Amino acid sequence: MKEKREFRDYLSDIFDAIEKIENFTQDISFDAFVEDEMRVFAVVRALEIIGEAAKNVPLEIKENYPSVPWKEMARTRDKLIHSYFGVDLNVVWKTVNKNLPPLKDQISEILKDLGNTSS
């Protein structure tokens, strides 16, 4: 039987997926990225995981951290899942380089804030 997950698990999933994306895209140009099918697939999958995890974070947590782009994460996941063959890699690359660094900091802060509280 599947173990029940706590909301912190989903926050950790987001953080871990961001770190994986950082590793997948470290020291690589956009041109090299788009030519590397495995890397593209891995990054897109990690973005899907971020969005799916965001959907599972309780509303109370989302309301306590309104500056986190919860809806945007979920929408990105939906766009990737439902239009995979139409994925714009320019948008993916921009998301990776512009949106994920501040998101990583936000999720890290939330995890620190919630570290000593019970779920």
From Swiss-Prot:
It comes from the Archaea. GO terms for cellular component: toxin-antitoxin complex. Its EC number is 3.1.-.-. It is an enzyme of class 3 (hydrolase). A motif (RX(4)HXY motif) lies at residues 77-84. Modified by cognate antitoxin MA_102; probably at least 2 successive AMPylation events occur on Tyr-84. The keyword Nucleotide-binding applies. The modification O-di-AMP-tyrosine is found at residue 84. The active site is at residues 77, 82. Transmembrane segments: none annotated. GO terms for molecular function: nucleotide binding; RNA nuclease activity. InterPro entries: HepT-like (IPR008201), HepT_RNase_toxin (IPR051813). The keyword Transport does not apply. Keywords: Hydrolase, Nuclease, Nucleotide-binding, Phosphoprotein, Toxin-antitoxin system. Homodimer, probably forms a complex with cognate antitoxin MA_102. Probable toxic component of a putative type VII toxin-antitoxin (TA) system, probably an RNase. Probably neutralized by cognate antitoxin MA_102. Neutralization may be due to AMPylation by MA_102. Belongs to the HepT RNase toxin family. This is Putative RNase MA_0101. It comes from Methanosarcina acetivorans (strain ATCC 35395 / DSM 2834 / JCM 12185 / C2A). The lineage of its organism: Archaea, Methanobacteriati, Methanobacteriota, Stenosarchaea group, Methanomicrobia.
